[in-house]
Each structure stands twice: as structure tokens, then as C-alpha cells.
């Protein structure tokens, strides 16, 4: 019954439920997990969003289209999509992940969305998979528009500092916690015009640096 409810939320009734079950299974729970589906779903999602943006913004250049796509397929956005269907309630996690609140973790939720896209593709074909992506992303695609806000925090911070002829920020990993498959990075970011060092956290060094850059942007009040 639980999976029946989820399928209604997703807008797709699976012919082969094994695809859905695999998409919901995190690597901490079983060897037969969603990692391969996630790989395939990532490619389908990038194509789907790229196609939608190409058609919606005929005057936008490659850089603007790439930045908008990055905004729509990033971890935080995928986690928003996951929460719309309360995906965390249906995840199959190992005991450790369950205890640490893995069903709320953005990285796990976002990976599962990508896996679900692949599962729908394998179950019903590319047209159905694309239709579901556009259904889930309808509001986000309506709201997105070209502009500075689409640039990632590190790029925005760097361009601001270069524009004011200031030194580039210095990032340094100061702490790594957790097992290899579930690491958390803490990064410091030194900016010439800020008296205090800012910090960021994330499931990878890159994400932690982006988070730290965002903290610097907010302190510098960069628009």
C-alpha cells in the first residue's frame, strides 16, 4: 500500500515494481541499491532540463543555459523535488543511516530522485520519463530566468573580488568526518575585506567550499 501511495504522488504506476524498489534502496541497506540507477538518471535529468531551457530561452547563450541548468539539477533543488512527494518516508536505509537521519539528508534525497527518473525510463521509456521530470519541475521551470543569481557562490565571490581588484579567497579543508561513503567536510574561507574567517560544510570538498563562499557573499552583502 505504501508504494501505491508513492506511485500516485510520482504520477507513474510501475509495470515492474522492482525498478521502484531498487530506486528507493540506499547503498547502506543492500548490495542491490540505487547507485547505477542514479548514474543513468543524472544523464536523463540533464538532458530533460537542458532541452526545456533551450526551448524556453531561444536568446540565451550557452553560459546562461548552463548556469540555469546547474541551478535546477543541483542537490538542493533535487531535495526540494523529493520533499514535494515526501520521498524520505519511502527510502530503504541501513541501520546507521536510519539512526543518523539519512531520510532527511539532501544528498540521499537528491540521489534517489535521479534513481527514480532512471527507474521510470527503464519501466516505461524515455517519453514517459521526460513527462514525469517536466511534471515535477513545472513550477521551477516557470520561475527560472537568466541572470547573475544563476552563478554558483564561488564564481560570484571571485568575480566580485576581481572587480574590486582584491585578492582571491583562500579555501582550506579544516576537518573531514565520517566513513568514506558518508563524509562531511568543513572548509574555511579567508577573504581580504572580511575581518572574520567564514566556514562551510558539505558532503564533498566542493560543496563545502560553495557553502563557505555563500557565507562570504552574505557578509559582504553582494547582490
UniProtKB/Swiss-Prot annotation:
Main location: cytoplasm
Molecular function GO labels: double-stranded RNA binding; metal ion binding; ribonuclease III activity; rRNA binding
Family according to the record: Belongs to the ribonuclease III family.
Gene it is expressed from: rnc
Primary role: Digests double-stranded RNA. Involved in the processing of primary rRNA transcript to yield the immediate precursors to the large and small rRNAs (23S and 16S). Processes some mRNAs, and tRNAs when they are encoded in the rRNA operon. Processes pre-crRNA and tracrRNA of type II CRISPR loci if present in the organism.
Taxonomic classification: Bacteria, Pseudomonadati, Pseudomonadota, Gammaproteobacteria, Pasteurellales
Keyword vocabulary terms for this entry: Cytoplasm, Endonuclease, Hydrolase, Magnesium, Metal-binding, mRNA processing, Nuclease, RNA-binding, rRNA processing, rRNA-binding, tRNA processing
Compartments where found: Cytoplasm
Domain RNase III: 3-125
Protein name in the entry: Ribonuclease 3
Species annotation: Histophilus somni (strain 2336) (Haemophilus somnus)
Amino acid at each position: 500500500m505504501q508504494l501505491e501511495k508513492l506511485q500516485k504522488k510520482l504520477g507513474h504506476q510501475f509495470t515492474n515494481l522492482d525498478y521502484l524498489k531498487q530506486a528507493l534502496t540506499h547503498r547502506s541497506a543492500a548490495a542491490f541499491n540505487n547507485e547505477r540507477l542514479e548514474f543513468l538518471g543524472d544523464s536523463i535529468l540533464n538532458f530533460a532540463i537542458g532541452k526545456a531551457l533551450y526551448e524556453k530561452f531561444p536568446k540565451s547563450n550557452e553560459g546562461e543555459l548552463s548556469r540555469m541548468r546547474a541551478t535546477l539539477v543541483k542537490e538542493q533543488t533535487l531535495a526540494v523535488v523529493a520533499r514535494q512527494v515526501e520521498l524520505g518516508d519511502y527510502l530503504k536505509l541501513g541501520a546507521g543511516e536510519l539512526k543518523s537521519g539519512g531520510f532527511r539528508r539532501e544528498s540521499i534525497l537528491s540521489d534517489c530522485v535521479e534513481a527514480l527518473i532512471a527507474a521510470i525510463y527503464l519501466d516505461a521509456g524515455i517519453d514517459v520519463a521526460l513527462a514525469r521530470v517536466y511534471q515535477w519541475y513545472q513550477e521551477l521551470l516557470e520561475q527560472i530566468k537568466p541572470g547573475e543569481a544563476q552563478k554558483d557562490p564561488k564564481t560570484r565571490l571571485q568575480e566580485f573580488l576581481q572587480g574590486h581588484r582584491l585578492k582571491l579567497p583562500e579555501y582550506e579543508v579544516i576537518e573531514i568526518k565520517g566513513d568514506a561513503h558518508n563524509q562531511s567536510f568543513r572548509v574555511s574561507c579567508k577573504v581580504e575585506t572580511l575581518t572574520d574567517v567564514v566556514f562551510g560544510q558539505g558532503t564533498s570538498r566542493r560543496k563545502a567550499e560553495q557553502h563557505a563562499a555563500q557565507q562570504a557573499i552574505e557578509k559582504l552583502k553582494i547582490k
